[in-house]
């Protein structure tokens, strides 16, 4: 009975930690109107201004940028269904093998050890994974994320109030 209460306590602690981290993450989101304010988009005069804009906007819009990257990951997986299937087979296979809890799999009069199940899963996933072109997807994802995030951060002007904040900090 104490093991059950211990696991319930651990589950409730885990959910409270997830809720707290989710609340902290969501508090960092800026509104869509503020994030996509077209009036504040301009070309930086030089590279140092672009660097300062990127630094400021990364700290200000980090949650929004993470949401954009998450949406790009979802889009990349939808765009490459074979990779999504390979990931599903891999997760399902590992889950099924772990469900055995270290015991061997018995199929009628054959016994397959736990290690052999992992080898079989790897032998199935490696060729399928190479055929699903994960490297192309990762390269596309890195490129699209950099263009979206760095492009927004470099071309989006900081608000006028931020200039006064730096002056106040220096005084």
From Swiss-Prot:
Family annotation (Pfam families):
PRA1 (PF03208)
Q: Name one GO molecular function term.
A: small GTPase binding
**What transmembrane ranges does the database entry give?**
67-87, 119-139, 140-160
Topological type in the membrane: Multi-pass membrane protein
- Give GO terms for biological process: endoplasmic reticulum to Golgi vesicle-mediated transport
Record GO cellular component, one term: membrane
* Family under the similarity heading: Belongs to the PRA1 family.
User: Which organism encodes this protein?
Assistant: Schizosaccharomyces pombe (strain 972 / ATCC 24843) (Fission yeast)
What InterPro entries does the annotation carry?
Prenylated_rab_accept_PRA1
Where it sits in the cell: the answer is: Membrane
Designated name of the protein: PRA1-like protein
The superkingdom listed in its UniProt entry is Eukaryota
| UniProt keyword terms in alphabetical order | Membrane, Transmembrane, Transmembrane helix
């Amino acid at each position: 009975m104490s093991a059950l209460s211990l696991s319930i306590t651990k589950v409730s602690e885990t959910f409270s930690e997830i809720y707290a981290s989710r609340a902290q993450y969501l508090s960092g989101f800026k509104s869509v109107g503020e994030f996509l304010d077209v009036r504040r988009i301009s070309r930086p005069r030089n590279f140092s201004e672009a660097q300062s804009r990127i630094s400021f906007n990364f700290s200000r819009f980090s949650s929004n940028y993470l949401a954009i990257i998450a949406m790009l990951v979802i889009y990349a997986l939808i765009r490459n269904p074979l990779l999504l299937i390979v990931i599903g087979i891999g997760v399902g296979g590992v889950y099924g093998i772990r469900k055995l809890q270290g015991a061997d799999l018995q199929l009628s009069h054959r016994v397959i050890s736990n290690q052999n199940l992992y080898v079989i899963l790897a032998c199935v996933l490696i060729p399928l994974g190479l055929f699903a072109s994960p490297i192309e997807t990762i390269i596309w994802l890195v490129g699209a994320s950099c263009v979206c995030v760095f492009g927004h951060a470099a071309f989006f002007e900081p608000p006028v109030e931020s200039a006064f904040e730096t002056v106040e900090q220096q005084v």
